[in-house]
């Protein structure tokens, strides 16, 4: 079973992702802020995190730094504000980077999760 945390300050987008990925092999939690994500991460170990970069109470890096300390965890940053510095930072921490406007979003997410 894959335990996934989706973090996005746009609840509709977070729920859309959760519904796309929900299935018998996925347990999905959502958080709508950096603070809420950190609280959930204190209570549960996530194998995967899909994180928005820009949120009212912080940036994706605030969450990535916690996840990067777990060698078994993977993360992907989804952003609607493409930026080369953000992309480089994500790769530096060993994550994946994807723009929300990518027309092949579902296939990219499946590749990230290791699903065929």
Task: Name each region found by the language model.
Residues 8:
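Conserved acidic carboxylate
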Residues 11-29:
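Two-component/phosphorelay signaling modules centered on CheY-like receiver
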Residues 30-48:
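Acidic, metal-coordinating helix/loop segments flanking the phosphotransfer/catalytic sites
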Residues 33, 59-62:
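Acidic catalytic/metal-coordinating carboxylates
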Residues 52:
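Active-site residues of response regulator receiver
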Residues 56:
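The feature encodes the CheY-like receiver
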Residues 61-72:
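Short amphipathic alpha-helix used as the core "switch/output" element in two-component signaling
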Residues 78-80:
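Hydrophobic/aromatic residues positioned on beta-strands within the core alpha/beta folds
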């Amino acid at each position: 079973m894959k335990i996934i945390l989706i973090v996005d300050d746009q609840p509709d987008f977070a729920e859309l992702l959760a519904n796309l990925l929900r299935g018998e092999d996925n347990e999905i939690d959502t958080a709508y802020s950096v603070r809420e994500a950190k609280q959930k991460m204190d209570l549960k170990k996530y194998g995967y995190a899909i994180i928005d970069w820009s949120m009212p109470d912080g940036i994706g890096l605030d969450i990535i730094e916690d996840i990067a300390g777990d060698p078994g965890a993977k993360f992907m940053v989804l952003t609607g504000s493409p930026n080369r510095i953000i992309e480089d930072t994500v790769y530096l921490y060993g994550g994946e980077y994807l723009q929300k406007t990518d027309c092949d979003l579902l296939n990219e997410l499946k590749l990230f999760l290791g699903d065929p």
